[in-house]
Amino acid sequence: MKILISADMEGATGVTWPADVLPGTPQWERCRSMFTSDVNAAVLGFFDGGADEVLINEAHWTMRNLLLERLDERAEMLTGRHKSLSMVEGVQHGDVDGIAFVGYHTGAGTEGVLAHTYLANSVTGVWLNGTRASEGLLNAHVVAEYGVPVVLVTGDDLTCVDADGYAPDARKVAVKDHVSRYAAVCRTPARTAADIRAAAKEAAPLAVRQEPARGGPFTVELEFDAAHLSDVATVVPGVARSGERRVAYTSPTMYEGIRTFKAVTTIVSSAVEEQYG
C-alpha cells in the first residue's frame, strides 16, 4: 500500500496568521516544527495501519517548508516547486492507493482560518460546475481521475466540514476551531499529533484504488478582487470573461482543468501591485 500526503500549511496546528506561513519570518520558522509534527503523525499512523510506502508532497507556497530531518525515516518527501500537478504531484504514476490532505483549509470567500484558494486575497471565489470550490475540492476531483480516494483530511473544524462534501468517507481531524480568518482555538501539538496518528491508522484500510472517475466536462469560474485581473487572466487560451471581475473556462478533464487554473493564478499574481492589488 502506498499513501501520498499532500501537505499544506495554513491548516496546520497553531497556524492562524499570515506570518505563520510566510517563508522567512520568525513565526514561519516556529510553525514549521508544528507543521512537520502534523505530517509526521500522519506518516506514523499510515505505517501503523499497514502502509508499505508513504510519499509526502510539499504543497505550500515555495514547497520548501517541512523539516525533512524530523520525519520518520521510512517516509520520502517530494519538495520544491514547478510540478505538473502541483499540490497532488505524484498521484499520476499509477502506484498510489490513497491520498491524505494534511494542513488544508477552506476556500476563498468562505469562513475559515486563512481561507483562500491558491492566492491569498486576489482570488475572492472559485466555483467548479457551479459549486464553490476549495483547494481540497479541486484536488479531490483531480485525484479521482487516477482512481485515488481521499482517506484523511486535517485542518480547522470548517475544513473538516468542507471535506465532508468531497470525501465523505475520509477520516477528519480538526487541529483547531475557527474563530475568525486570523484566530482559532488551537490544540497543542502533542494532542493533535496523537489525534492525527490515530485517524491515519483508521484511514489506511480506506486506501483502495478505484475506477478512474470520468466526470467531465468541468467548468471553472474565478472571481478576483480587481477588474483588471480578469483581463490579465484571458491571456490563457480558453479563458474568457464571465463578469466584471470574473473569468471562466471549461476543460474535458480535471487534469487539464487544474493545469489551466494554475496558469491563470500564476499570470494573475504577476499583475498584482503592492498597494492597489
Where in the sequence are the language-model features?
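N-terminal glycine-rich phosphate/adenylate-binding segment common to multiple enzyme folds
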Residues: 78-121
